[in-house]
């Protein structure tokens, strides 16, 4: 098959199946690195590829899933050697049938900043090395799979796009709740990957065909029509013995439903064998892929928050230094705490997007905007509007943004369009076009509409579709140009209905220089919404403005069943009073006000600097133990409960833990200064078992346990059973946590548990990892199975207090 045939959708394209279980079944020993199979057992590896090719696979994934520098450290071989040998084995098999060879790339095994410690550009470099090696070795395409972190996937896509000219396939793994391990939604994945230039997108691993089907349907609706969708499910769900519950016939029968939803490529993942692919080939070969009918929608996103701009959407305006001395000083000082608190406050007030501007004379705008984006991504899950016309600042901010942002802005000048539109296209961003040019802002609606037409045409020519174009017809102050308000609204309405794009306005500009600005702002906002305004850049902390937005959504059926309106105002009492000027004002009483515990709120929000300051303040009035038990632990519990319920996601959980750690440092310092002994709730030993180099889950467990007051000895990854036994013996730990991600290393987990039992140590063992289930954990001798870090903390509290 020629690589171009993969995309023509004339027939189904067949991917291969599982590799790890095949290697294990054909002689790979526990602890042996699967990535080295091409060097240590090339005949076996080639035979596996050949079996898949003979079963009908059109694309063979080379055995390079973990062939990166981090995972190959200490193995005695370079990335280039391993990748080249692996591609050669796959190519030898592919040549017998004409199949294509994919450079298979999996996750690096570490969380990226801010959730972890791996920098975005460091992840990029790791992927780039593998991709260059794969391209040099003759791979036909790059296949990024089993990703759970959208930020890591972005680094990998950029590495592929910038270091080779091969097609790029991307695939993420979703849990049963419809989100990845880090909380990414199907829609956020779809629009981000497609926006970055992925040639095909898909879903693999974690679940079986039946469970993945609804997520694949959402994926097909969310990617552009020209981007193929593929699926590679597991062979059903895992059994207690590590096998899977579907045979080839059952697998193919469940997979057949995908033929009708727009998927055009099918294959298998864990537990599938050449027999599964052969049966899949037999089932799908007579069929033709159904047309994929995506929904063309305007949207912005972060991994966990997908904002569809289908009606009035609020953009918080407070992170803009214009006229804000406190923010100006914070930007000059490099103080991230203040803009972060502004971000959190706007989110809680109802903003759905945050405008971020670092344009201040005397500072490095590019460096400041880049750092602001990093800092804000750590504390809020709202999409960002990158407010700059500086190409360097936008390039740096767009590169490290996690998701799909919007750029504010371009104007009608060709030079600006030529510099900024390609950046928006490269990074998959939406763009705001200002209806002005070198002649300034036209006084009439016709003049502004003409500029908008030029902007839309230029954006379309750059490959940016109408749904990603937002036109700002510009709000002029009523005090200076009173007739301008009507012209703005007329131009806005024409852009919305004649050009088929979205609209945006900075609403508050209308009232500059006039008294009682809130009256004008609210009235103009209502008029603009009626004219077709989509993005309202405004202060969400103004109750009257948010009330107008929420009421408008109810009256235009955007807020179905008035759900959001009722949630906001069910407990609000309206009081009408007379001011000194005899003007009636409305005060909202009983709205959700922040509680009196500043430390609790800072930890809950994940604000590190505020948590430290609140702890310092609390310690001047309260005993350290009281601060821990009344503020810190309840805050962590609240965030943990949200995580269990699916309302809080991994990044927020880790940010709360980081904020709590900052508070704990203040508490430790207070205890040390008082000369009091610092007690521990108990000692826990944790490790990733021998042969496994994945430690994301283990590291998260460590952070959470430490913040609950336990002494945690982290032995790292690829840990021998003897080291675990010795650590427990030396520390007297009563609880041991073992982690494994790969099926090939679960036997080493069992060996470690057996070694602990043989040593007659008085400890309990909890285990976790993607390949484990409660039944499987029991079968290998573990005392407890913990599905996540919160479960580990709950167990520690149960056993150790």
Language model features: what each stretch is:
Residues 1-801:
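Domain-level signal for soluble alpha/beta catalytic cores
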